[in-house]
Amino acid sequence: MLPLGTQLINFDLPNTITGQNYPSTQIATDRPVLIMIICNHCPYVVHYHDELKRLHHNFSEQISFVAISSNDVNNYPEDSPEKMKELWHELGFSFPYLYDETQTVAKAYQAECTPEFYLFSDQHNLVYRGRCDSTLPKSNAVSYTHLRAHETIP
């Protein structure tokens, strides 16, 4: 697991929405950052789709959001950059959705599964890493209890 206190790890990945690279230096430096390691096909990610949209809508003025997919498109063609862009439009997301083809960034963050969340303070020090909460697909409503525990997200 990436140790708490770790500085935001630099990256420069293709934004599947704009077609341009999105460097981590483009992230606002004066507010917290939520890095979300997600993908299109995973039922655990699908479980959070509506809540990710709501969370971004409610907190995008206070927190920078960045989603990254690092899945192998040979094994998961539904996670291709083209499909990522389609899903982004279909769901009405408005945060960057980046593609980590070599899995370099996911490995640097020591991501083990999807979804995995990394919340950095306004100083860009890691204050939380892990799941949103303990809900599972087709079980409870999403509560974000784990993410909220550190009090960076109200």
Where are these regions (language model features)?
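A short beta-strand-turn-helix
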Residues: 12-32
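Non-catalytic, surface beta->alpha helical segment in thiol-disulfide oxidoreductase systems
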Residues: 127-144
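Short, internal strand/loop/helix patches
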Residues: 85-114, 127
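A short, hydrophobic beta-strand/beta-hairpin element that forms part of a small beta-sheet core
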Residues: 115-131
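N-proximal helix/coil linker or "cap" segments that precede and/or mark the start of modular domains
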Residues: 1-12
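Short active-site neighborhood of thiol/selenol oxidoreductases, capturing the structured segment around
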Residues: 27-43
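Structural microenvironment flanking redox-active thiols in thiol-disulfide oxidoreductases
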Residues: 47-89, 105
